[in-house]
């Protein structure tokens, strides 16, 4: 009898653990679906601001984060973080929240980011104005990398070039980079060997729309 009771107790504990795991997975999936829905609603209202129809997929976010050196001194700045998919990948890469500076134009997304990443610094502002915005915010703190989820192809070519030039002028260190993704087969800003180098990663197929990551660094 005692053995049967003990077996029943173990079974109940095992079932309780399994249920907890299933509930956790369901909550996570629901949260991701809710993010997709919220992002899609914002895109429907302001398509030129968001550019993408849905948040970046995890494989693309990991590819973006892989271009960042988490040991580099200074801030990692993210432009247009949206719901924080790339932000989370950067943290998983090893970037401390305290070293993250997130610039988000949409105030609802900015509030969401503050709740999700309470130790990161979140600024509601225009990421295309980093030449004026970043020095005022970062001060003397060096910038290790700038990661961009901005929809560059929705902007004129000169504005795209200016953003890359402004970003690279703010980044310090030999390994510092401006990192951008796009769905197009060509880079959003072409190579300029006199000003910066350009490297494209392999195409990330496991995304809603296949994308590639482009890494810009100042020419030596």
Q: Over which residues does each language-model region extend?
A:
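Conserved SAM-binding loop of SAM-dependent methyltransferases across substrates and taxa
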Residues: 83-95
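A short glycine-rich, Lys/Arg-flanked "PGG" loop and its adjoining helix->strand segment in the class I
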Residues: 161-174
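Conserved class I S-adenosyl-L-methionine
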Residues: 72-82
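A short SAM/SAH-binding and catalytic strip from SAM-dependent methyltransferases
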Residues: 142-159
